[in-house]
């Protein structure tokens, strides 16, 4: 084989390797971001079951959830359109509103919506063959 053929083979292997590495990094970023949000949701849910929503601990956890989401959302916006994941931030703001208005049913519904968004976003944001091609 000539040098030209070897160069083409090595180039293709390097490009495919880079694409695979990018997809793996993307997948890890998405998974860790949404796992943190999911962990906060379950922690908030446990505290609400024990003490109700009118509690400083719940407000603090929701603030932590909001901060965590803002940090991760900026990184996720490089992977998808911001409007696709904007609903998550809206629901987090609603959580804070429901704490102030002392509406536990709406609070829990909003928390369930956040968990639902986490699950659905993981399906369309993960690495797949379309990303590689």
Predicted regions located by residue number:
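Transmembrane signal-anchor/signal-peptide helices with a preference for the extracytoplasmic
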Residues: 19-36
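Structured, soluble extracytoplasmic/luminal domains of envelope-associated proteins
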Residues: 77-125
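N-terminal positive-inside, membrane-proximal cytosolic segments immediately preceding the first
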Residues: 1-7
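Short, charged, intrinsically disordered terminal tails
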Residues: 123-133
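Short extracytoplasmic
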Residues: 41-75
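Hydrophobic membrane-insertion alpha-helices, especially the h-region
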Residues: 8-24
């Amino acid at each position: 084989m000539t040098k030209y053929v070897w160069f083409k083979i090595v180039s293709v292997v390097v490009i495919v390797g880079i694409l695979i590495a990018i997809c793996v990094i993307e997948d890890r970023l998405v998974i860790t971001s949404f796992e943190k949000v999911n962990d906060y949701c379950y922690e908030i849910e446990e505290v609400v079951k024990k003490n109700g929503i009118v509690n400083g601990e719940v407000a603090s956890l929701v603030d932590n959830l909001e901060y965590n989401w803002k940090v991760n959302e900026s990184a996720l916006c490089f992977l998808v359109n911001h409007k696709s994941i904007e609903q998550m931030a809206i629901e987090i703001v609603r959580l804070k509103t429901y704490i102030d208005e002392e509406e536990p049913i709406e609070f829990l519904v909003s928390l369930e919506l956040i968990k639902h968004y986490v699950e659905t976003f993981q399906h369309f944001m993960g690495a797949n063959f379309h990303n590689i091609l």
